[in-house]
């Protein structure tokens, strides 16, 4: 039951409506004339220009093997009409979830801009070539970190983690190129449904949903 300590939380409120004050247009179905990919790319670019930290960050929701929801933040690294791609350790908890239930949802939350995008659909692993192409663009430190971490597995201390990093750093010291770890790669989320959300006054937000070729406005 909510108590006195929750009153501060209950008073927390953001009044949306900056789109009215600065003269920007309302989100509407015609914003999707060029497709959902074009608008999502634009909103990511808008977030970057606005100084949003990690504008391509998205909250990934999965279902655990025992049927419980789980979420975490990952980064969108590719985007086209087939869907969106992120990369991770194939032995991680999220990978276990996706092996059991190959379906996921993501949310791009740009709170500073009063915008969100929700996307959901079936998930599949990308090809080894797609993984290789992205891996080659990662900083060497990130590559070594992927080798050092047995993602989602317990470890005694941070010192132990840094020792694992030191070991792989020494292992690949004479290698010009760090190879892709055998248990690392990408996932593609095919977009069954995409929803664009824009905050508005009095909680009468703009919601536009794309399902296949159908684009429609939803009540908030």
Swiss-Prot record:
Keywords: Flavoprotein, FMN, Oxidoreductase, Pyridoxine biosynthesis. The keyword Flavoprotein applies. It catalyses: pyridoxamine 5'-phosphate + O2 + H2O = pyridoxal 5'-phosphate + H2O2 + NH4(+); pyridoxine 5'-phosphate + O2 = pyridoxal 5'-phosphate + H2O2. InterPro entries: Pyridox_Oxase, Pyridox_Oxase_CS, Pyridox_Oxase_N, Pyridoxamine_oxidase_dimer_C, Split_barrel_FMN-bd. One of its GO terms (molecular function) is FMN binding. Its cofactor is FMN. Transmembrane segments: none annotated. Signal peptide: none annotated. Binds 1 FMN per subunit. It holds the Pfam family PNPOx_N. FMN binds at residues 72-77, 87-88, 94, 116, 151-152, 197, 207. One of its GO terms (biological process) is pyridoxine biosynthetic process. It is an enzyme of class 1 (oxidoreductase). Substrate binds at residues 13-16, 77, 134, 138, 142, 203-205. Its EC number is 1.4.3.5. Pathway: Cofactor metabolism; pyridoxal 5'-phosphate salvage; pyridoxal 5'-phosphate from pyridoxamine 5'-phosphate: step 1/1; Cofactor metabolism; pyridoxal 5'-phosphate salvage; pyridoxal 5'-phosphate from pyridoxine 5'-phosphate: step 1/1. Catalyzes the oxidation of either pyridoxine 5'-phosphate (PNP) or pyridoxamine 5'-phosphate (PMP) into pyridoxal 5'-phosphate (PLP). Belongs to the pyridoxamine 5'-phosphate oxidase family. Homodimer. This is Pyridoxine/pyridoxamine 5'-phosphate oxidase. It comes from Mycolicibacterium paratuberculosis (strain ATCC BAA-968 / K-10) (Mycobacterium paratuberculosis).
